[in-house]
UniProtKB/Swiss-Prot annotation:
It is found in: Cytoplasm. Pfam families: ADK, ADK_lid. InterPro entries: Adenyl_kin_sub (IPR006259), Adenylat/UMP-CMP_kin (IPR000850), Adenylat_kinase_CS (IPR033690), Adenylate_kinase_lid-dom (IPR007862), P-loop_NTPase (IPR027417). AMP binds at residues 31, 36, 57-59, 85-88, 92, 156, 167. One of its GO terms (cellular component) is cytoplasm. This is Adenylate kinase. Consists of three domains, a large central CORE domain and two small peripheral domains, NMPbind and LID, which undergo movements during catalysis. The LID domain closes over the site of phosphoryl transfer upon ATP binding. Assembling and dissambling the active center during each catalytic cycle provides an effective means to prevent ATP hydrolysis. Residues 122-159 are annotated as: LID. Catalyzes the reversible transfer of the terminal phosphate group between ATP and AMP. Plays an important role in cellular energy homeostasis and in adenine nucleotide metabolism.
Length: 220
């Protein structure tokens, strides 16, 4: 099982990726995880990427593709893989195709932008522990305070409404065209000896379990 998960930031791709990788026994290749690790390590790549991420912009293709090419060499990718957050652009999708990276399915999780803004801008974090809350869906017992320590909660820069909206604008311009790209390729069929992936679209609204079942049904 080799697949790509598509959807806007905050659509729930990460949650569903966990279910899919467990069901099919494949690794999740998340460029977000790779980037966060690089940022945490303070590597040159991480420092450069952090500037883009804090501004709500996409990290350039050259930085991402270098990470992904290294990851695909690992032995656990031999029987399949799940791309979460990659490709983000047509150029990256073309680079994958040129490299002969086989994909069986492209699964889009569709969530209205208004819902995403509410989901993401409502997040609050306790910096010391990493505990997360949501002002509407998972509020702390005392507003603005961590349940365990009583210390103040913060809103991360990349969860602020203006940053979320900026990320969605970038997604609309750079990543959403992939929906057409893969949909058209699925209709055309095999190209350059590479089998076209099957394209599937599901709603990302509802409970986590409901969305999981939709995803599993789409990948049968």
């Amino acid at each position: 099982m080799r697949l790509i998960l598509l959807g806007a930031p905050g659509a729930g791709k990460g949650t569903q990726a966990n279910f899919i990788k467990e069901k099919f026994g494949i690794p999740q290749i998340s460029t977000g995880d790779m980037l966060r690790a690089a940022v945490k390590a303070g590597s040159p790549l991480g420092v450069e990427a952090k500037g883009y991420m804090d501004a709500g912009k996409l990290v350039p293709d050259a930085l991402i593709i270098g990470l992904v090419k290294e990851r695909l060499k690992d032995a656990d990718c031999a029987n399949g893989y799940l791309f979460d957050g990659f490709p983000r652009t047509i150029a990256q999708a073309d680079a994958m195709k040129d490299a002969g990276v086989a994909i069986d399915y492209v699964l889009e999780i569709d969530v209205p932008f208004s819902e995403i803004v509410e989901r993401m801008s409502g997040r609050r974090t306790h910096p010391a522990s990493g505990r997360t809350y949501h002002v509407k869906f998972n509020p702390p017992k005392v507003e603005g305070k961590d349940d365990v320590t009583g210390e103040p909660l913060i809103q991360r820069d990349d969860d602020k409404e203006e940053t979320v909206k900026k990320r969605l604008e970038v997604y609309e311009a750079q990543t959403k065209p992939l929906i057409t790209y893969y949909g058209d390729w699925a209709k055309r069929g095999e190209e350059n000896g590479l089998k076209a992936p099957q394209y599937r679209k599901i709603s990302g609204l509802g409970t986590v379990d409901e969305i999981r079942e939709r995803a599993f049904d789409a990948l049968k």
